[in-house]
């Protein structure tokens, strides 16, 4: 299992998965950026938008792309981030209208949560409904290994 760790986040990836944990660059000295995690069961392109621009159009039906996007401290305590702990996904959470950028055949899932005092959005794009049971199991296995430090 390949390990990733940066910016207070750590996780293990199964064989065949790729991932990056990074922070966007800032243009203003006082600006603070937060962690963005990209994970996939296929090769990730170097150029990626936060929520999958540059990635999802090239996905095949068995592919899955996962984003963990950290929001700032102003989001803590808001109703949107009330869910506590790293979530698990279910097939029922996925739909074509839950995509940031709808593409034929793809399904999306989005869940906001707080883990260890840090607010996140989990965004998952599945390549197709046909592979959804396997995709859900793989994503949950990866999320089970996620360690969020305060």
Predicted segment positions?
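Short aromatic-glycine motifs in intrinsically disordered, low-complexity regions
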Residues: 1-12, 135
């Amino acid at each position: 299992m390949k390990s990733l760790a940066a910016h207070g986040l750590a996780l293990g990836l199964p064989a065949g998965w790729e991932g990056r944990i990074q922070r966007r660059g800032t243009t203003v000295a006082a600006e603070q950026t937060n962690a963005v995690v990209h994970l996939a069961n296929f090769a990730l392109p170097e150029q990626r938008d936060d929520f999958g621009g540059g990635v999802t159009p090239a996905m095949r039906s068995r592919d899955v792309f996962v984003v963990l996007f950290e929001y700032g401290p102003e989001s803590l305590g808001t109703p949107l981030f009330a869910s506590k702990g790293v979530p698990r996904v279910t097939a029922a959470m996925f739909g074509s209208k839950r995509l940031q950028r709808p593409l034929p055949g793809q399904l999306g899932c989005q869940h906001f949560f707080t883990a260890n005092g840090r607010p996140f959005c989990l965004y998952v794009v599945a390549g197709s409904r046909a592979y959804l049971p396997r995709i859900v199991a793989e994503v949950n296995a990866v999320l089970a290994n996620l360690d969020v430090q305060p």
